[in-house]
Amino acid sequence: MFKKSFWFSFIPTVVWCFVILVGSFISTSGIPSIAVSDKLIHFLFYAIFAVLLYMPIRINTKRAYSFVLTCVIVFLTGFFLGSIIELVQHLVIDGRFGEYLDLLANTLGIVTALLICEILKRKSVL
């Protein structure tokens, strides 16, 4: 089915997912505030996540999935991850609040990254 190297190509994605989870669930008390908008951070973190998930699915397989299927997989995975994190923040984590605008920033980061990946693939850069 898939080669061992295919599964190893997901290691950066899993590590980045862990970074997102840790950053989303740690308490913000005692951490100095950043001058950058948190929505920009959400956008960038999920854009990076989308690229790291896109690459092994679309590029590193012999039978590359279609662009649409790859986008659906990446989008739904990222959207599900972001939704669950926002829900857990809202219901469980003290001092953290789930926000719809965070989820919107996550989604825009995913969509933007997918569009850039496909443009670069068509120009044979990726």
Language-model features and meaning:
Residues 1-103, 107-126:
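Bulky hydrophobic segments
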